[in-house]
């Protein structure tokens, strides 16, 4: 949403928004994760990502309009096959709102990832283009094939398919995603010594009363020259309270810790020692951190047209349709 708004010229990145915890859109009260505490207050464009502020994202999408929003969904290849070299990839066009059927409430909830579905490979491919300067490459599973002597038989050097955003928009998004990991909802994925960026996700699953969630984290390192992207989704974490995205962050952190040295990617930041927090005690991403909060009503009152099995994430990139 933010990348599309910046690229379309709907925002400059200098805007600020007031979050009082909820927003009335199309006859519906759509809530932010901080609604029980009165909202986030003054929220910058960077904060809308770093803090996962639904209200700010809804206002950004409204400024952009549904036509531009739908156009950029297609630019990022949502609803289209990626043609990754794996069998069975399905089209997901029917899981997105056509622009002529997208109402104001649909646009509002779509702005933070609810009410449309994309695959993990679609998310990863689009996300890579956002952080690499705007270049969307054909995704592949295997980089190269060698014989028993190490001779390369076949190698994929990357096929550039299109440009999604400008290099200036990409630089801004990397800055915002860096803030998410350094001081936002993604700080539990931080590996000491490495500059990292990322985004958290929290998806409510129906029926909401059962308190089941799908949580995710997508992150990259290092920030200036991204070399590694990790995307983790945890379906119904084995915990009393499932809605903490920190469960996915902890897994992602472990992968980063093992993989960065293996790839000879060296630390690029000073190590700062911080106090560890148990993921189960951390504030939920996309859900209020007030203990008496009921996850089942943390999103939309009278939500229309919700999928039968899951509700897409209320705060970020869509981890469904695995």
Segments predicted by a language model, with ranges:
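Short, solvent-exposed mixed-charge patches
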Residues: 319-322
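Beta-lactam-recognizing serine transpeptidase/beta-lactamase-like catalytic domain environment
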Residues: 3-234
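Intrinsically disordered, low-complexity acidic/polar segments
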Residues: 227, 239-241, 262
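A short acidic/glycine-rich loop-to-helix N-cap element
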Residues: 235-247
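Short A/G/S/P-biased low-complexity tracts
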Residues: 18, 314-317
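Short, gly/Ser/Thr-rich active-site loops of penicillin-recognizing serine hydrolases
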Residues: 151-157, 249-309, 315
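Short, well-ordered alpha-helical segments
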Residues: 167, 171, 246-254
């Amino acid at each position: 949403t933010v990348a599309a708004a910046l690229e379309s010229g709907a925002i400059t990145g200098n805007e600020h928004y007031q979050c009082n915890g909820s927003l009335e859109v199309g006859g519906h009260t759509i809530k932010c994760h901080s609604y029980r505490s009165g909202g986030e207050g003054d929220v910058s464009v960077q904060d809308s990502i770093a803090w996962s502020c639904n209200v700010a994202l809804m206002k950004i999408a409204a400024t952009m309009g549904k036509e531009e929003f739908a156009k950029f969904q297609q630019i990022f290849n949502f609803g289209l096959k990626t043609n990754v070299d794996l069998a069975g990839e399905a089209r997901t066009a029917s899981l997105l709102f056509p622009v002529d059927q997208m109402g104001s409430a649909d646009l509002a909830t779509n702005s933070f990832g609810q009410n449309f579905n994309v695959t993990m490979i679609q998310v990863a491919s689009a996300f890579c283009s956002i952080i690499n300067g705007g270049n969307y490459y054909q995704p592949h599973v295997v980089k190269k094939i060698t014989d028993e002597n190490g001779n390369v038989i076949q190698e994929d050097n990357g096929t550039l398919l299109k440009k999604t955003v400008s290099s200036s928009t990409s630089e801004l998004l990397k800055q915002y995603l860096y803030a998410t990991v350094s001081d936002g909802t993604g700080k539990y994925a931080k590996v000491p010594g490495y500059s990292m960026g990322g985004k958290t996700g929290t998806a409510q699953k129906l029926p909401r009363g059962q308190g089941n969630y799908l949580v995710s984290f997508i992150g990259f390192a290092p920030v200036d020259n991204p070399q590694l992207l990790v995307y983790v989704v945890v379906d119904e974490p084995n915990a009393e309270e499932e809605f903490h995205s920190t469960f996915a962050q902890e897994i992602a952190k472990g992968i980063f810790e093992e993989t960065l040295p293996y790839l000879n990617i060296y630390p690029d930041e000073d190590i700062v020692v911080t106090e560890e927090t148990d993921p189960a005690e951390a504030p939920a991403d996309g859900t209020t951190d007030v203990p008496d909060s009921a996850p089942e009503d943390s999103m939309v009152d009278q939500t229309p047209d919700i999928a039968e099995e899951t509700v897409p994430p209320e705060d970020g990139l869509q981890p469904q349709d695995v």
